[in-house]
Amino acid sequence: MSLFRVYTRVLELLGKERRLGWTLAVANLLLATAQFAEPVLFGRIVDVMSGNLATGALAPEARSPWPLLAAWVGFGLFTIFCSAAVSLHADRLAHRQRQAVLTSYFEHILQLPTTFHTGTHSGRLIKVMLQGTDALWRVWLGFFREHFAALLSLLVLLPLSLYINWRLAMLLFALCGVFTVLTTLVVRKTYGLQSEVEAQYSDLSARASDALGNVALVQSYVRIDAEVQGLRFVADKLLAAQMPVLSWWALVTVITRASTTITVLAIFALGIVLNQQGLTSIGEIVMFVSFATLLIQRLEQVVSFVNSLMMEAPRLQEFIDVLDEVPAVRDRPNAIDPGRLSGLVEFQDVSFSYDGKRPAVEDLSFTALPGQTIALVGATGAGKSTAIALLHRAFDPQSGTVKIDGMDIRGLTLAGLRRNIGVVFQEALLFDRSIADNLRVGKPDATDAELRLAAERAQALDFIERSGLGFNTAAGERGRMLSGGERQRLSIARALLKDPPILILDEATSALDAVTEAKVNLALDEVMRGRTTFVIAHRLSTIRHATRILVFENGRVIESGTFDDLVAQRGHFAELARAQFMVQEDARASVAAAADHASVRP
C-alpha cells in the first residue's frame, strides 16, 4: 500500500468526527490567512517609517504607522486564540477517535474466524492494536495541528505574494520548489528502508514474546544465555537497518537549513536590485524575507509530518490489514433471533472446503433428535471439528444446509444461534479473572446461589470452597492457578449455567488422569442430561453409550450406528476399537507383570 493510500485510509477512519474535522479545516484556513497578514503589516510599517513608500498593490494609504500597528495587534490576538482553539479541539478529536477506533478494532478481531487467530499470534494482534491506535492518534494530531495548516498556508501565500510583487514571489517559489524536490527524493528513498526497520521491530517483539511465553522451558534447559544472544542478534539487525534511515534524515536537516539561508540571501539580493530600479520597496523586501521564513517553517512542518507518517506507515499498514480481514460469517439483513430452541439438528448434503480445493466435509447428512448424544470419531483431519464448526456457524457451507428445529442457521442471528449452543473444550478456556466472573460468562446475571448450584453439579464446589477466597479466587492467566481437572469442571459449570439445548464436548477429558477424569465424567453426565450433545472423541471408551456414532474419513461419514452395532460390522470403527482396547489390555498386562516381578524379588 502506497504512503498516500495509507494517509487517506487514516483520514477515513475519522468516521463520525468528520464534521469537527471540517470545522478545524476552516479554522486552519483563517489561521493561515491571519499569520500572513502579520508580515504584510510589518512590511508596510517599515515603508511608512522609512518614507520609502511602496507603489504596488498593497501600498499603504496612511502616513502613520499606528493604524497598521493596531491592525497587527488585532491579527496577532486572533492568531493566538485561533491557534489555542485548533490545538484544543484537535487534541480532543484525536483522543476521542483513538478510543473509538481501538474499541472498533477489538470488536472486529473478536469476530474473525478461529482460523485467523490460529495463524496469528495473539501478542501480535495486541501490539498492532496498541501501536496502530497510537500511530493514528499522532497522525490525526499532526494533521490538524500542523500539516493541514501548512498546506493551507501555501495556498494562501501563493496568490498573496504574486499580488504584492510577482518578481520576488517567483524567486521565492522557485527556491522552495528545489527544496521540496530534494526533500521528496529523500523521503522516497527512506520509505522502503523504514519498512525494513519495522519488520525488524516485529521480529524483535516476536522473539522476546516467544521466550517469555516459554520461560519455564528456557530455565529448565538452561537457555537464558542462548535466548539473550538470539535477541541481541535480532537487535543488531534492527540497528543495522536503522542507521541508513538516520543518515538520510540527517541530510534532510542539512537541506532545510541550507534552504533557509540561501532563500533569505537570494531575496535580499534580488530585492536590492529591484529597489535600486524602483520596482520594490524596503518594506516589501522585509515582507518577503518574512514570507520566506514562514514558508520554510511550513515546509519543515510538512517534511516533519511526512517523516512521522513514513515512520508510522508500517504500523498503520498492519492495523489497516487487520481491519480489512473479513469475518467468515455475518448476520444476514433479515436474520431473526429464534429464542430458545429444542435441539433438533439436521445436516443436509453439507459440503465445505477451506481452500476451495480439498473438501473438509463432503455430502454430510445426518439428524440428531433432541436429547440424543452423537459421537464423532475419526483420525485427525477427517472432518469432525469442521462439522462442529459448521454447526456453530464459524463458517458457512459451500453447499447443503445445516438446520436447527427446521430453520436454516444462516437465517438466525449469530448471537441467537450461539446462545443455544454450549461448548466444553479440550483445554478449558478461562479468563484471568475470578472464578465467579468466569462462571458468569455462561450467564452474566447469575445469582450467587446459581453459581453454587452449578459448581456443585459440576463437582467443582469442594475445591472452590477449599480456597480462602471461594468464588472470588483468581483463576490466573488462562486459568494457570488451577489444575487441569479444576479448570475443566469450571468449564462444565459454566455450560450448566448457560443451560443450552445443544452441547458440544470437544475431547473434554483427553488430557486428564484417571481419577480426575472420573470426577469430570460425573459432571459431564449431569450437563449432558436432556440436551442434544455432540462429542468429538479419540478415546472410544468415552462414547460407549452414545445414541449414534459417526465415523469420519476424508470428510465423509463412512460408518454410522451404535457402539455395539459398529463393532459387530467389523469395519473401520471395529478396527479402532480393537486397537484401543488391545493397547489398554497390554498396558494392564505390563502393570500386572511388573507387580508380580516386584513381589518375587528377594
Swiss-Prot record:
PROSITE patterns named among the record's database cross-references: ABC_TM1F (PS50929), ABC_TRANSPORTER_1 (PS00211), ABC_TRANSPORTER_2 (PS50893), NDVA (PS51317)
Subcellular location: Cell inner membrane
Domain ABC transporter: 345-579
Membrane topology: Multi-pass membrane protein
Alphabetized Gene3D superfamilies for the sequence: ABC transporter type 1, transmembrane domain, P-loop containing nucleotide triphosphate hydrolases
The keyword Electron transport belongs to this UniProt entry's keyword annotation: no
Family: Belongs to the ABC transporter superfamily. Beta-(1-->2)glucan exporter (TC 3.A.1.108.1) family.
Subunit-level organization: Homodimer.
Description of its domains: In NdvA the ATP-binding domain (NBD) and the transmembrane domain (TMD) are fused.
Family matches, as PANTHER family: ATP-BINDING CASSETTE SUB-FAMILY B MEMBER 10, MITOCHONDRIAL, ATP-DEPENDENT PERMEASE MDL1, MITOCHONDRIAL
NCBIfam families, per database record: PRK13657.1 (NF010178)
Cited function: Involved in beta-(1-->2)glucan export. Transmembrane domains (TMD) form a pore in the inner membrane and the ATP-binding domain (NBD) is responsible for energy generation.
The protein's name: Beta-(1-->2)glucan export ATP-binding/permease protein NdvA
Encoding gene per record: ndvA
